[in-house]
Amino acid sequence: MKYIITLLLVALLFSCQEKSTQEFLAFGDYRAELQISKTEVLPFTFKVKDANNLTVFNAEEKIEVNEIEYRNDSVFINMPVFEALLAAKIENQTLNGNFIIEGKGRVVPFTAKKSKTRFNVEAKAEANITGNWETLFSPDTAEDKYIAKGVFKQNGNQVTGTFLTETGDYRFLEGVVNGTDLKLSTFDGAHAFLFTGKVTDSTINGTFFSGNHWKEPFTAKRNANYKLPSANALTYLNEGYDSLAFTFPDANGNQVSLTDDRFKNKVVIVQ
C-alpha cells in the first residue's frame, strides 16, 4: 500500500511538472467530498483565508491549518497533529486528488469546489431529533455491538451533535434532516465519519462509515433519561480480589511482580 501511495504522489508531481504556471488556493468557502464508497460521499467545509491558511469546520469545531505546500498546479495540505495529507491538483478553483493517511496505508479520492453548503436540502424535515437517543451499533453482531448515546440539536433542517460511547465520542458532527433522511459528517484529518439514516420522531435506523475502510449499522430510540454506564465501572477487579496481582518475566527473563519492594508506596500505572 505504501508503494501505491508513493506512486500516487509521484504521478501528481509529474503532472505538476507538465504545467509551469504556479497555482494557489483561491480565497473563500469550499465544500470538500471524500468518495468513501461507490454510492456515498463524505462532505466537509473549509474556508481559505489566504494561500497559506485555511479553516476546517465541523459544527462548533474550527481546525486551523497552516502547513500548505504548492508545487506548480498542485497543493499539499498537511492536517495538524495527525499524519494526514490532502493532495490535489488545482484547476479553475476546483481541487481533485486524494486524502492520504500514509502510516495506515489509506487513500480516499478527494475533491473540493467553491461552496458553503455541507449537505444539500431538498425537503422540509419530517422529524426533529433534538434530544437524547439510546443507541446500539452493530446490533445484530454479538462480538461487535456496543452502546452509545446520541445527543443532538436540530434547528429546521440543520443538525449538530455527537454519539457518546463508553470510551469517548464521535467528534463534532454536523449535518441535516432532509425529509426523513439523516446525514451527519465530520473530518479532522484523523477521523472521517459519515452517518446516514432514516428518522422518525422516535427512531433512527442508519449506517456509520469510517473513511472507506469500515461501516456498520446502528439503531437508536428516543430516550430523554438514557445514561451511559459510569466510566468508573468499566474497569474492575474480579470477585475475590482487592488489588492487582501478577508476575511476568522481563526482557532479561527475570520475574517481575507488583508486590516487589521497588513498587511499594509508589504510584504504579498498569496499561
Feature roles, as predicted:
Residues 265-268:
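Alpha/beta-hydrolase fold active-site loops
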Residues 24-90, 119-199:
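Central antiparallel beta-sheet cores of small beta-barrel/beta-sandwich binding domains
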Residues 16-20, 115-122, 228-234, 253-257:
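A short, compositionally biased domain-edge/stem linker segment
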Residues 95-121, 206-232:
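Short, structured interface segments
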Residues 1-27:
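Bacterial Sec-dependent N-terminal signal peptides
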Residues 223-261:
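N-terminal "domain-start" segment that seeds a small globular fold
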